Amino acid sequence: LVGSEMCIRDRYQFDHEVWEGFRFWDLVMPLFLFMTGASMPFSLSKYKTASVDYWPVYRRILKRVILLFIFGMIVQGNLLGFDSKHIYFYSNTLQSIAVGYFIAAVIQLHFSFGWQIIITLLLLLAYWIPMTFLGDFTPAGNFAEQVDRWVLGRFRDGVFWNEDGTWSFSSQYNYTWIWSSLTFGVTVMLGAFAGKIMKEGKANRKKVVQILLLIG
């Protein structure tokens, strides 16, 4: 099929949209976040008791978060290149999973299901307000981009170095991470809600499928 008309027509689906639009490839990272959340009701439910000691729980959670961040820096952050000019702190799907997982773990460990829904909606609202009313909707002018540039500075992926030793932000790199972490947490929580439905509906799998299809 390589080189066929169908392949040529559809291959653009296996890359991210430059800015506006949507492609199949844009589903990959959210799907990983969602699957992470779907497993959490099964793994965290045993810790939701009044007498639980949360320190060992958080120690395991933080260990996973740190490992995912390190692996992310190895995969895409150029950590093993040992070149300080090309090391990026927050630039990878693994790191977005780490942050989303941590946010969702805190919510699930300490809040009832009703409050989990409310907090998830509040996270979306907290993301939406500055994105709508601060900055603009251009790649370089949106609020999330400005936060990344301010917090990460030259350790942001997409930075390029000039011959005189100065650095600049690339106009071709439009991915945002710091402020978008709120939505990473939301996506993991959506997976957790789906996982809760599956966990509590094991006796009637047909109904579980119907509910999941109904809510999308």
Segments the model singles out, each with a brief description of its role:
Residues 1-8:
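Short, small-residue-biased leader/transition segments that mark boundaries at the very start
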Residues 9-89, 94-97, 101:
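Membrane helical hairpin/interfacial module
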Residues 29-39, 97-109, 183-195:
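Hydrophobic cores of alpha-helical transmembrane segments in multi-pass inner/ER membrane proteins
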Residues 34, 70-74, 103, 107, ...:
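Lipid-exposed faces of alpha-helical membrane segments in multi-pass integral membrane proteins
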Residues 45-49, 80-82, 99-116, 126, ...:
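Membrane-water interface regions at transmembrane-helix termini and the short interhelical loops
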Residues 49-58, 110-115, 197-208:
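Membrane-interface helix-boundary motifs at transmembrane edges
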Residues 113-186:
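Long hydrophobic alpha-helical segments that form multi-pass transmembrane helix bundles
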Residues 173-216:
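A conserved active-site cap/scaffold subdomain adjacent to cofactor or substrate pockets
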